[in-house]
Amino acid sequence: MHDPRPLAEKAAALLKARGERIAIAESSAGGLISAALLGVPGASAYFTGGGIIYTPRALKTLLGVAREDLKDMRSSSEPYAAFLAETVRAKHRVEWGLSETGAAGPTGNPYGDPPGHTCFAVAGPVNLARTLRTGSADRIATMWAFAEASLALLVSALEQRS
């Protein structure tokens, strides 16, 4: 099983040291990214909020984005992940946004991506986006892998800013 705590602790330390804050928009990680960051003592100093953007209704309700606002962009893509990260960052008026969007399994998504596929992005002073394919249909293991990879990307962005 993956353990994102060391990455969450590193991200928290970097955010707190600079007095910066983050908001999260995650999908198939199911709240594990937020939970890892909130599990670090003192999270209120750097974590402002976010949501699990699992459906078009959640996208509209939590971020104020309608499907027609996305034009030709599809979920589970790096451009969509970057859009979500920037949107959640701007909505919360914070320095950093982190997003994740994928297919945890045991089946793929409606866009043809296999289980274990996700895209994730960081928006802020450093912008990064990546794709991960775990090759696994194990839903729980994949969700943890998505959270860990997303936090690793966040740490990378924070370290690039240093």
What are the functions of these language-model segments?
Residues 1-162:
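Short alpha-helical segments enriched in small residues
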